[in-house]
Amino acid sequence: MKLTCVLIITVLFLTACQLTTAVTYSRGEHKHRALMSTGTNYRLPKTCRSSGRYCRSPYDCCRRYCRRITDACV
């Protein structure tokens, strides 16, 4: 019983040590990407579509207007 408790505490301690030391930086970036903050916004720059191009929503078009009849940017 005591040996089991000691083993469990040891495993928990080693896991906690690894998590706290995993936030080391290498050239300004995290070594472990899984531990990076997910609160920041990592979006690729979106290009808008010119008039006459196919669109599904107004946000696809540069002028923010998508004609629903023809599904084309205006």
Swiss-Prot record:
Expressed by the venom duct. Residues 1-22 form the signal peptide. One of its GO terms (molecular function) is ion channel inhibitor activity. It is found in: Secreted. It comes from the Eukaryota. GO terms for cellular component: extracellular region. InterPro entries: Conotoxin. Keywords: Cleavage on pair of basic residues, Disulfide bond, Knottin, Neurotoxin, Secreted, Signal, Toxin. The presence of a 'disulfide through disulfide knot' structurally defines this protein as a knottin. This is Conotoxin MiK41.
